[in-house]
A protein has these predicted regions:
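Basic, Lys/Arg-rich alpha-helical nucleic-acid-recognition elements, primarily the DNA-binding modules
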Residues: 1-93
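Generic preference for well-ordered secondary structure
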Residues: 9, 23, 34, 51, ...
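Solvent-exposed, non-transmembrane amphipathic alpha-helical segments
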Residues: 45, 59, 70-73, 87, ...
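Short alpha-helical interface elements
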Residues: 50-54, 64, 68, 75-78, ...
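Charged, helix-prone or intrinsically disordered regulatory segments positioned adjacent to compact structured domains
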Residues: 73-76, 80-134
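Hydrophobic protein-protein interaction segments
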Residues: 109-304
Length: 304
């Protein structure tokens, strides 16, 4: 393909997407560790009404107003006129899972590689990296619970991807892969030499897996290796019939991960989606694909 799999036309997100509102409520509830009855009490409605809300069956406008206040956003934002903001990794990755579950195609850049393309072993290493990523004084029960919940959502995403095999286009930065191989799968610097060696070998296996994808020309998976500068934040476009979302995130699942600090955004703005499409198409056009991309990564592996 000469262009990334972003479709020739630009789907427009629904102006008032009630299903998305319900999904945001569920993501908020999970992030806040609230039961449905807790939210029902705060909104002064029945638990049955909460289930209807989460299914996208909106009831009354005053309920929407109370829901907007609960989520800490304006009513316009809740109705999808503006942008979703997520200061919680739990709510953000839950929204990603929801959007992926009904997408036909996703186009993404993650640093260093998309979690959906990693091995099953990576899930185990990611837990180690997250445990290492913060000082012991901050490693309380709440942080441990956050790790468990994020990893649970990520595993659901990966399982769903393996079942439905939606079309994926992944942009991978060559410089980011070089840094990935240099550090290995570590949550912080300064680990013992033996541990560092083990983590570097694990990183090599993940990169070798990407090489296999490139050489095999796997159906439904397009990968472009980009030598140009890549954005510092990760992004992903979710596409389905008649709608497109773009998500931008500071949360990081590679070496030196970050789940604690940052604000992610999700929007259906035609301007925002269009700008990201244009950037993706430019990066994709200049990227190395197939055996050419595999050779570039092979050269890096030979150096490490």
């Amino acid at each position: 393909l000469n262009r990334a799999a972003t479709t020739s036309r630009a789907p427009r997100g629904a102006r008032f997407n009630f299903r998305a509102i319900g999904e945001r409520l569920r993501a908020y509830r999970l992030a806040a560790e609230l039961r449905s009855e807790d939210v029902a009490e705060q909104l002064d409605i029945s638990r049955a009404a909460i289930y209807k809300l989460e299914r996208g069956e909106i009831v009354k406008i005053d309920t929407l107003e109370r829901l907007a206040a609960l989520l800490g956003v304006s009513l316009a934002n809740l109705l999808g006129v503006e942008v979703e903001y997520h200061d919680s990794a739990v709510s953000y990755f839950e929204r990603m899972r929801q959007l992926e579950s009904r997408s036909e195609r996703i186009v993404a850049h993650f640093d260093p590689i998309s979690f959906l393309l990693t091995s099953e072993d990576y899930d185990v290493w990611l837990r180690h990296m997250l445990d290492e990523s913060i000082p012991p004084t901050l490693a309380d029960r709440h942080w441990a619970n956050t790790i468990d919940r994020v990893l649970g959502i990520l595993q659901e995403r990966k399982s769903s991807f393996s079942r439905q095999r939606l079309a994926v286009t992944s942009l991978i930065g060559l410089r980011q892969i070089e840094q990935f191989l240099h550090h290995g799968l570590v949550g912080r610097l300064g680990l013992p030499p033996g541990v560092q060696l083990e983590r570097k070998m694990a990183a090599r296996r993940e990169v070798a897996r990407i090489v296999e994808f490139l050489e095999a020309d796997t159906t439904g998976v397009q990968i472009g290796i980009v030598s140009d500068n890549m954005p510092n934040e990760t992004f992903q476009i979710f596409e389905a019939q008649g709608e497109a979302y773009v998500a931008v995130s500071p949360f990081r699942l590679g070496e030196l991960p970050n789940l604690r600090t940052g604000i992610a955004t999700i929007t259906t703005s035609p301007d925002g989606v269009g700008m990201y499409r244009a950037m993706i198409d430019r990066l994709w056009a200049d990227s190395a694909k197939g055996k050419e991309g595999a050779a570039l990564l092979g050269q890096l592996l030979a150096r490490f």
